[in-house]
Regions:
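FNR-like FAD-binding dehydrogenase module
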Residues: 1-304
Length: 304
């Protein structure tokens, strides 16, 4: 069964169906123009770029009296949302934790938009029990064995899966040896955006799995807390020798977060580190990283 989104972005296609139901002549002409080849660009600006909702379009064209069975053809079905699990089944049996950022943006015409799913989740009462359908799929970040050294890069909500990794390894450390983890986290402001601050600090101290005593490390970059922006790749450069040592020990690399520039910037940082520490040319460092990808030891999970 599909659910329709009256507050979702409507799909005004290049056909005149809506104009058939407009009783006001100027509205009919405008809708017919949108459906014409000449109106294609204006339709894009009005509809897709602004992500106007069904209700907003009907408010803009109040004379349109569409039968329900026609209206549903324009209303988008609700899409499934994909989230990385941010908990370990060893630490939280029968639970699944999610790390969700409330999506918000401003359109070119200064309309404030908020993500439907993330806003809905943020508005839930923590004490209220609700039932939702959930589907589990194999992700792009395989669960690592306890003796595999890890280099984790997770700015923003990209840290979500690595919270589960750290929880899992902390439980595994109680019953046997584990390999070290170093984690690079980044956000804009330490005061406002430092996700799971207490969790990371707890595990990076007192012989925790991220502590230097265990061969690990936790490094945070706060991009807007100083005049010069600092990102995860800058923190990686500061720890280039530690990264190189772990790579020489067979470490796997996991990268998660925004799919804009971050994954490519992180890859370039690894190239620079490998070239610097090994003395090899950048081309050789790039080939070595590609060999890690082919061997299943360089994983990226990115989203827009």
């Amino acid at each position: 069964m599909s659910h329709l989104l009256l507050h979702g972005a409507i799909s005004l296609r290049q056909d005149p169906v809506m104009s058939f139901f407009a009783t006001a002549e100027h509205e009919k002409e405008r809708l017919q123009y949108f459906a014409s080849p000449e109106g294609r660009d204006d339709l894009y600006q009005y509809n897709q770029k602004e992500r106007r909702t069904v209700l907003e379009v009907l408010e803009d064209f109040p004379s349109v009296q569409m039968p329900f069975e026609w209206l549903v053809e324009l209303v988008p079905p609700m899409k499934n949302r994909a989230f990385s699990i941010s908990s370990s089944p060893l630490a939280h049996p029968n639970q699944v934790h999610l790390t969700v950022d409330v999506v918000s943006w401003t359109t070119p015409f200064k309309r404030k938009r908020r993500g439907l799913c993330s806003t809905g989740l943020a508005g839930l009462d923590p004490e209220q029990k609700i039932y939702i359908p959930v589907w589990f799929h194999k992700g792009l970040l395989p669960s690592p064995p306890p003796l595999l050294p890890l280099i984790l890069i997770g700015p923003g909500t990209g840290c979500a899966p690595f919270r589960g990794f750290v929880e899992e390894r902390a439980i595994q450390s109680l019953s046997g040896p584990i390999a070290p983890i170093i984690l690079f986290f980044g956000c804009q402001n330490e005061e406002n955006d430092f996700l799971y601050r207490d969790f990371w600090l707890f595990h990076s101290q007192n012989d925790g799995v991220l502590s230097e005593a265990k061969g690990g490390g936790f490094y945070a970059a706060f991009s807007r807390d100083q005049p010069q922006k600092v990102y995860v790749q800058h923190k990686m450069q500061e720890q280039s020798q530690r990264i190189w040592n772990l790579l020489c020990e067979g470490a796997a690399i996991y990268v998660a977060g925004s799919s804009t520039k971050m994954p490519s910037d992180v890859m370039l940082a690894f190239e620079e580190i490998i070239s610097k520490e090994s003395g090899a040319p950048r081309e050789s460092a790039a080939r070595w990283l590609r060999s890690l990808e082919k061997a299943g030891k360089y994983h990226v999970e990115a989203w827009s």
